[in-house]
Structure formats: C-alpha cells, structure tokens
C-alpha cells in the first residue's frame, strides 16, 4: 500500500478578499477533504494555525494519476508537495538488501 505525506498551501493571491466569500471557499474545500477521509483516500489532515498551510496523509491503492486528479480539484487555489514514504519495515528491508 502506498503512503504519501502531502503538504499544502493556499495561494493568498487567489483567496477571496471578502471574509464571507473566503469562508464559503474554505468550507467547500473542507467538505471535499472530509469526503476524502470518509472514502479512505486521506487518513489524516490538518491545517497549521493561522498559516493557510497544512498537511495530509494519504494511503491506499490509489494510483499516482488518481492522486493527481484528486489534487487538481483544488487548483489553482492550493498548491501541494507530495512525498511517497516508506514504513520502518520497508526501510529495514532496504537496509538489509544493501548488505547482500
């Protein structure tokens, strides 16, 4: 199962200036995130207080193309950095293979 550590950042130049519009946009995106959590695409998500940035943990059998499609739903308002991660067991397996 692939796991991803994703950092995200809202583009402040694209965020609505009006607080009501900005709140509506945030709510829409938060509901999209909640749906991804319910569907198992995202296992954890958080926003850094007062920064317009945060992180997400994704896991599953989702292909990179499908992950990219999901992230494109937030474009151009949010940018992402995606890092595929290994478990400690995978690191141990890699380490042992290096000693062969």
Where are these regions (language model features)?
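Short S/T/G/P-rich N-terminal loop/turn motif that feeds into the first structured element of a domain
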Residues: 1-53, 62-65, 92-100
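An amphipathic, aromatic/His-enriched active-site/gating alpha helix that lines ligand/cofactor pockets
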Residues: 35-36, 59-93
């Amino acid at each position: 199962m692939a796991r991803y550590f994703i950092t995200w950042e809202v583009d402040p130049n694209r965020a609505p200036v009006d607080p009501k519009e900005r709140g509506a946009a945030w709510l829409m995106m938060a509901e999209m995130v909640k749906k991804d959590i319910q569907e198992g695409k995202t296992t954890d998500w958080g926003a850094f207080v007062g920064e317009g940035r945060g992180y997400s943990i994704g896991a599953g059998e989702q292909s990179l193309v499908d992950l990219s499609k999901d992230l494109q739903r937030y474009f151009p308002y949010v940018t992402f950095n995606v890092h595929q991660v290994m478990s400690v067991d995978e690191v141990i397996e890699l380490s042992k293979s290096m000693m062969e």
